[in-house]
């Protein structure tokens, strides 16, 4: 592929689907804090004036679902009916039940190391050296834009902004290298009193320019700031939100394949989540080791079975050592059984709420972003 465009999008923490994700993961964290081996599958639905939290949980812990829900919505910034949603007055419905014993018998084993996968499925992980964090640039900068929107909103610098927002960035590539940004879209909810020209100028000066590198912007870059001209009704009043509806935003912005399983609200026994994190960890360490410029990992599992049913490594012709060496390096240096994933990445801890907005990958505070295996892989492959 010579010259081409590639686009990714992100959404803010105040987007309805992201409200749902954050509530689901806040519940998960609260349970894991008391019971690290709990089984949790928590789903959330939000709409005007109400939140419904449901799913299946097996745990010795007790958590206050209503208070967790209200506090999460409060932190996001929906604290007044003028915004279309109010953490203090919305209804909170709890419909959580217990996990099926049929599932549990396949997961729990006498030997913890033989813990079976919580479900069948396919999971992908990806890394590329086009950014320092080994993530695709389009999704990286889309996340940074909506993170900046939240920052200037919460600090009061742009106090007319409201929590709901979306971003989209189109990058120009030539021979696989970034040469510029072709288009930027940023839509943000706002109060009724601000004018569209004032909002557009403020967003350009306080959000877009501080985030996007100037060398990638030029006279031909197209900027679309609130292109409809008005975005007062937003959040759950504008659209209902559901856990797990932003799986491409959560991962690689479409630059890599996706197995279809969502992350939020699931404890680490669910390989939809833990194996996707492990696949990112493997791919990132391969790229960090200099074994390839780009790497995609696919893992697959059968319910109740510990070992993956398959491991696939794709390097898109960018490998620096033989494909067989890369495959063998993965098999010998990464324990990809469910128990191994949890131990390798220290997943039985309450770290998930902060993953639920602005992407699960490319953020150094998460254990699956470590490149601690890179030196080992270099030695294995004989890379100097």
Swiss-Prot record:
GO terms for molecular function: ATP binding; magnesium ion binding; methionine adenosyltransferase activity. Keywords: ATP-binding, Cytoplasm, Magnesium, Metal-binding, Nucleotide-binding, One-carbon metabolism, Potassium, Transferase. It is an enzyme of class 2 (transferase). Residues 99-109 are annotated as: Flexible loop. It catalyses: L-methionine + ATP + H2O = S-adenosyl-L-methionine + phosphate + diphosphate. SUPFAM superfamilies: S-adenosylmethionine synthetase. L-methionine binds at residues 56, 99, 239, 270. The keyword Cell wall biogenesis/degradation does not apply. Binds 2 divalent ions per subunit. Binds 1 potassium ion per subunit. It is found in: Cytoplasm. One of its GO terms (biological process) is one-carbon metabolic process. InterPro entries: ADOMET_SYNTHASE_CS (IPR022631), S-AdoMet_synt_C (IPR022630), S-AdoMet_synt_central (IPR022629), S-AdoMet_synt_N (IPR022628), S-AdoMet_synthetase (IPR002133), S-AdoMet_synthetase_sfam (IPR022636). Catalyzes the formation of S-adenosylmethionine (AdoMet) from methionine and ATP. The overall synthetic reaction is composed of two sequential steps, AdoMet formation and the subsequent tripolyphosphate hydrolysis which occurs prior to release of AdoMet from the enzyme. NCBIfam families: metK (TIGR01034). Belongs to the AdoMet synthase family. This is S-adenosylmethionine synthase. The gene is metK.
């Amino acid at each position: 592929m010579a010259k081409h465009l590639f686009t990714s999008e992100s959404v803010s923490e105040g987007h309805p689907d992201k409200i749902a994700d954050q509530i689901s993961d806040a519940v998960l964290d609260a349970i894991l804090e008391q019971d690290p081996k709990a089984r949790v599958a928590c789903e959330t639905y939000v709409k005007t004036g109400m939140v419904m939290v449901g799913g299946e949980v097996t745990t010795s812990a007790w958590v206050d679902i209503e208070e967790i829900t209200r506090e999460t919505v409060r932190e996001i910034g929906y604290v007044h009916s003028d915004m279309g949603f109010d953490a203090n007055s919305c209804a909170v419905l709890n419909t959580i039940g217990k996990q099926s014993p049929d599932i549990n018998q396949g997961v729990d084993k006498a030997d913890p190391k033989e813990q079976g996968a919580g479900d069948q499925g396919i999971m992908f992980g990806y890394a590329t050296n086009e950014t320092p964090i080994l993530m695709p640039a389009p999704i990286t900068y889309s996340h940074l834009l909506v993170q900046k929107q939240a920052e200037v909103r919460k600090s009061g610098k742009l106090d007319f902004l409201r929590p709901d927002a979306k971003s989209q960035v189109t990058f120009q590539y030539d021979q696989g290298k970034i040469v510029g940004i072709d288009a930027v879209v940023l839509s943000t909810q706002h109060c009724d009193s601000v004018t569209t020209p004032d909002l557009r100028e403020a967003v350009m000066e306080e959000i877009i320019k501080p985030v996007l590198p100037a060398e990638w912007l030029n006279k031909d870059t197209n900027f679309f700031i609130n292109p409809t001209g008005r975005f007062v009704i937003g959040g759950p009043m504008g659209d209902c939100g559901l856990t797990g509806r932003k799986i491409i935003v959560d991962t690689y912005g479409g630059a890599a394949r996706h197995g279809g399983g969502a992350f939020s609200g699931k404890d680490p026994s669910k390989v939809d989540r833990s194996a996707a994190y492990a696949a990112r960890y493997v791919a990132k360490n391969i790229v960090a080791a200099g074994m390839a410029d780009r790497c995609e990992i696919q893992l697959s599992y059968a319910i109740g079975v510990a070992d993956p049913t398959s491991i696939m490594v794709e390097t898109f012709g960018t490998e620096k050592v033989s494909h067989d060496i890369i495959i063998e390096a993965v098999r010998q240096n990464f324990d990809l059984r469910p128990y191994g994933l949890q131990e390798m990445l220290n997943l039985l801890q309450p770290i998930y709420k902060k993953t639920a907005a602005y992407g699960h990958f490319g953020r150094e505070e998460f254990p699956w972003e470590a490149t601690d295996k890179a030196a080992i892989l270099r030695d294995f492959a004989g890379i100097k």
